[in-house]
């Protein structure tokens, strides 16, 4: 530890102690908050089922930065490189299309054995795993419908895929000793004016009920469902709307997934957390950065990311909220994208933990909104960066932009060889 860091750390401890904050306790609490990194940033959501196939489902990865992962070994190596540069606890979020098999496997036939390497890798790296059925980029999703499909056989295919995915998820949870959160998102919807909005939702309701009909050990597996406002090609009608899934998660007591990019641009999920928590047992968050639409830009340390973190910490939702990331930028170094976004999420959590929330609550309850605003703004100038640097030091990761040197070296030695 450098003398400069020691001095900054001691000063930060004193400054935060003056407003009633124990920085050591804040760092202990930060170690209770894993962030689930998404594997699909590493290869632009290509997966290994059909890497040359087109990405469908109303989502899009833009850019053509060289060096994307082409197989599971490369993807795991890239993830390891990124994780070395991110302090504190982490998880990995997998999609079903990231299976490994020497022969083609139909999505309704995926089994834990197809993800054995991921499980062993996660155990070796002390990671939890989360999972997702992949209801997109497939011939049977080409017409824009999956779990709400009017064709019984096609709908059953996707039901069986989600059932098989639950078994994989439970396998991860059992093997790793931490529950896997399995999130169901479907692209189902219509491009133009829709006459019958009810029937697809009735089919989706029945399909989801069949998917989750078998009770699984909650210590191994957690079901989550995710809404969306619209997607490319489904601008006019989305079957799985916010109202649909809020009602579903409430009535079935599943987890509800809130994605930062899946709402109208004037809406923010930070404002939805406390409302949803009154009705559902758990939340899954997909922290992202929409720019005019759900374009999944790399997460910044911006107002909304901070507000999301503050909601989790202020209401002590550590055991009820699962923090995941969801962005895929193919225009920049993909490892850097992981590092930037994940570090920013963790910085936001740390800043929330360094807030004098009890004092702010007193001011709010007393109606002293002047002091509330003044203190909220003044705390932004407190030396939280020194606390972050100490956290990085203790986790043997670079504190500042030094991590970029490691990424550039990896790019030169490894990524540049991929063509």
Swiss-Prot record:
Signal sequence region: none
EC top class, as a word: isomerase
EC number: 5.3.1.14
The keyword Metal-binding is annotated on this UniProt entry: yes
Organism in which the protein naturally occurs: Shigella boydii serotype 4 (strain Sb227)
GO CC list: cytoplasm
Single GO BP term: rhamnose catabolic process
Cofactor note: Binds 1 Mn(2+) ion per subunit.
InterPro entries named among the record's database cross-references: L-rhamnose_isomerase (IPR050337), Rhamnose_isomerase (IPR009308), Xyl_isomerase-like_sf (IPR036237)
Listed Pfam families: RhaA
Keywords of this entry: Cytoplasm, Isomerase, Manganese, Metal-binding, Rhamnose metabolism
Substrates-to-products reaction catalysed: L-rhamnopyranose = L-rhamnulose
Cofactor: Mn(2+)
A Gene Ontology molecular function term of the record: L-rhamnose isomerase activity
Regions that span the bilayer: none
Record bears the keyword Isomerase: yes
Positions of Mn(2+) binding: 262, 294, 296
Record-stated family: Belongs to the rhamnose isomerase family.
Cell compartment(s), UniProt: Cytoplasm
Assembly description: Homotetramer.
Covalent S-S links between cysteines: none
Identification of the protein by name: L-rhamnose isomerase
């Amino acid at each position: 530890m450098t003398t400069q860091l020691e001095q900054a750390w001691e000063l930060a401890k004193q400054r935060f102690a003056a407003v009633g904050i124990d920085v050591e306790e804040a760092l202990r609490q930060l170690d209770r908050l894993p962030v689930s990194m998404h594997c699909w940033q590493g290869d632009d959501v290509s997966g290994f089922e059909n890497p040359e196939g087109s990405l469908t489902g109303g989502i899009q990865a833009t850019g053509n930065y060289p060096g994307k992962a082409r197989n599971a070994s490369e993807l795991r190596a890239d993830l390891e490189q990124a994780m070395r540069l991110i302090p504190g606890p982490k998880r990995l979020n997998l999609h079903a299309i990231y299976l490994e098999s020497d022969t083609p496997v139909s999505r309704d036939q995926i089994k834990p054995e197809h993800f054995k390497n991921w499980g062993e890798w996660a155990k070796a790296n002390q990671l939890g795993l989360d999972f997702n059925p992949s209801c997109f980029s497939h011939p049977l999703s080409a017409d824009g419908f999956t779990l709400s499909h009017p064709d019984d056989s096609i709908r059953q295919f996707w039901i069986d895929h989600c059932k098989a995915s639950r078994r994989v998820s439970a396998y991860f949870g059992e093997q790793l000793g931490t529950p896997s959160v399995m999130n169901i998102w479907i692209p189902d919807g219509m491009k133009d004016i829709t006459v019958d909005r009810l029937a697809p939702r009735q089919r989706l309701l029945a399909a989801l009920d069949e998917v989750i009909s078998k009770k699984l050990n909650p210590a191994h597996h957690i079901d989550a469902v995710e809404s969306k406002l619209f997607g490319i090609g489904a601008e006019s009608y989305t079957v799985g709307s916010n109202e649909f899934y809020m009602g579903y998660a409430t009535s079935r007591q599943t987890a509800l997934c809130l994605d930062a990019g899946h709402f109208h641009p004037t809406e923010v999920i930070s404002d939805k957390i406390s409302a949803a928590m009154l009705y559902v047992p758990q939340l899954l968050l997909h922290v992202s950065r929409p720019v005019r639409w759900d374009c999944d830009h790399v997460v910044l340390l911006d107002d909304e990311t901070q507000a999301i973190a503050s909601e989790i910490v202020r209401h002590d939702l550590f055991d009820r909220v699962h923090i995941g990331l969801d962005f895929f930028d193919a225009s920049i170094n993909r490892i850097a994208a992981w590092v930037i976004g994940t570090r920013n999420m963790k910085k936001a959590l740390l800043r929330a933990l360094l807030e004098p929330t009890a004092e702010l609550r007193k001011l709010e309850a007393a109606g002293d909104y002047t002091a509330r605003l003044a203190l909220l703004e003044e705390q932004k100038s407190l030396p939280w960066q020194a606390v972050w640097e100490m956290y990085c030091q203790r986790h043997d990761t670079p504190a500042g932009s030094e991590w970029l040197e490691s990424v550039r070296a990896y790019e030169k030695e490894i990524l540049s060889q991929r063509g």
